[in-house]
Amino acid sequence: MKPSRFSQAFRPLMAAACAALMLSSCSSLSYYSQAAQGQLELLTDSRPIDDWIADPHTSVKLRHRLETARQIRRYAIQEMKLPDNGSYSNYTHLKRPYVLWNVVATPELSLKPVQWCFPVAGCVNYRGYYSKAEAQAFARDLRAKGHDVEVGGVPAYSTLGWFSDPLISTFINYPDAQLARMLFHELAHQVTYVPGDSQFNESFANAVEEAGVEGWLERFGNPMMRDAYDRYAARKKDFLALLLKYRGELDRTYKSMVPTARSGWPRRACSWP
């Protein structure tokens, strides 16, 4: 008997989850449990793009977005030689704005993020939750320890080829060029991923996405699409420059602050711009 789509998705997921559990402490069991459950729901709730397009109940807007995504995926495989697997051949509709919420934390008066280590992915500067409430609860625990914490929504992520990542409602309505950028980026992670080296992994994926979008726009874009993407890229570049500027200023401020022996709080208050 041919295994069902559910069992095909379930068995490798459970194998990965079991391996993770064996390598983790008891305090991590609930975290891995929510991760396995969230990934399983994402896979089992997906349907092939062709089914959605053929379904008379699918809106005209969604049908158009799925057709665009299918064309982008075809370009990624045929022209960019990115992995030709089940990724982005299915679509999942979620009743929430993000697929994940990442928790990022730094110790008090530090810009060096706390790291968490996982099987396969290695050590990363974030911890993801499929539930916003669970992410916020974990963030509260970190703040109670004196950490600076941020909880941010994530529209997409890559399972690095372990599973067939679906298109998701959290990003399907991105403008065409930004949707292409997203898919090229996530597929690039399936090509090269060094566990524990987020800077290299993101730099590689960014290089692939930028080259891919340029080629895709040349083939399928129009002046309006090109102008919109150029403005998006410029805003992204300006925002990154702003972050780096204030990161440098904040780093200098932190280094100039001397904690008191009694409370640990700085003797001199921060001087914010």
Name these PLM-found stretches.
Residues 244-273:
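Pan-zinc metallopeptidase signature
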Residues 20-47:
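Bacterial Sec signal peptide processing site at the extreme N-terminus
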Residues 67, 74, 143, 237, ...:
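Generic structural signal for well-ordered, non-transmembrane alpha-helical segments
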Residues 71-237:
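Acidic/His-rich structured neighborhood in mature extracellular/periplasmic domains
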Residues 2-14:
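Bacterial N-terminal signal peptides that target proteins for export
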Residues 43-60, 114-124:
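Acidic/histidine-rich, surface-exposed loop or edge segments in extracytoplasmic proteins
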Residues 47-79:
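Post-signal-peptide N-terminal segment of Sec-exported extracytoplasmic proteins
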